Amino acid sequence: MLDANKLQQAVDQAYTQFHSLNGGQNADYIPFLANVPGQLAAVAIVTCDGNVYSAGDSDYRFALESISKVCTLALALEDVGPQAVQDKIGADPTGLPFNSVIALELHGGKPLSPLVNAGAIATTSLINAENVEQRWQRILHIQQQLAGEQVALSDEVNQSEQTTNFHNRAIAWLLYSAGYLYCDAMEACDVYTRQCSTLLNTIELATLGATLAAGGVNPLTHKRVLQADNVPYILAEMMMEGLYGRSGDWAYRVGLPGKSGVGGGILAVVPGVMGIAAFSPPLDEDGNSVRGQKMVASVAKQLGYNVFKG
């Protein structure tokens, strides 16, 4: 049994030590994100037996952004299976920025990773759907099943992103021309933009992590969301590419599958034990929350979790 006092102390200490850390800046290429108060910070744990521990602004709802890629990957694995995902998307780090076009050009148009923009747009196109609205509703539903029913599209975020997503539209057409997009290019880009524009709070983000940690069963609803056999593929992708250009450094220092988003959220999974999440808007040059990385790493270190430990 996990010690409740120890878990709350770990969360409290991480928040106290790092919630006012200086450094980084909000994402400024999406107007909505540029205006989120930079002083916000939160950290939370949700365990596989459904206990919740949090500190800071844990009720504040922020944009899911790139963490949505984990949810859509999970749905694609359910729809088409791991072999098709590997064949049609890939399972390798690109070694380049998350929005790189060069990565596509270097590999014949294949996106390699479902956790970079090109691969995520291709993954969105893999979802079984008869039209754009069905594709979107299925992706929203998997987000809600994984994290909580309160997850919802923000029209403000979506509008802010849809008016600035020209780079992703270009990526979608490159994928389409290379044969690595499996629906209409602008449909894929539209739905991908929507999936990044949902709002959730830090506890819900930790619940997403706990659902993965529990082999696909949401520990708060007790409902099976994913096949247990598909979860290791998600965690492997998170370990390789979850923090963009910092993924190797994160694996080396923290040793947990993770995923960040430019909305300031960051998630880590301790398989079989818990999800750890944090939120704070200022980002490093790779697009990861400066304080969030420190808070999650602190919790993991205090509790002694690292998947590479014996």
UniProtKB/Swiss-Prot annotation:
Gene Ontology biological process: glutamate biosynthetic process; glutamine catabolic process; negative regulation of growth; response to acidic pH
Result after altering residue 69 to A: Loss of activity
UniProt keyword list: Acetylation, Hydrolase
Keyword Ribonucleoprotein: no
Gene Ontology MF terms in the entry: glutaminase activity
EC number per UniProt: 3.5.1.2
Record-linked InterPro entries: Beta-lactam/transpept-like, Glutaminase
Binding site for substrate: 66, 117, 161, 168, 192, 244, 262
Reactions accelerated catalytically: L-glutamine + H2O = L-glutamate + NH4(+)
Entry-annotated residues carrying N6-acetyllysine: 294
Highest taxon above the source species: Bacteria
GO cellular component, one term: protein-containing complex
Subunit-level organization: Homotetramer.
Family: Belongs to the glutaminase family.
Record-linked PANTHER family: GLUTAMINASE (PTHR12544), GLUTAMINASE 1 (PTHR12544:SF48)
Name of this chain's protein: Glutaminase 1
Annotated organism of origin: Escherichia coli (strain K12)
Lineage: Bacteria, Pseudomonadati, Pseudomonadota, Gammaproteobacteria, Enterobacterales
Gene that this sequence comes from: glsA1
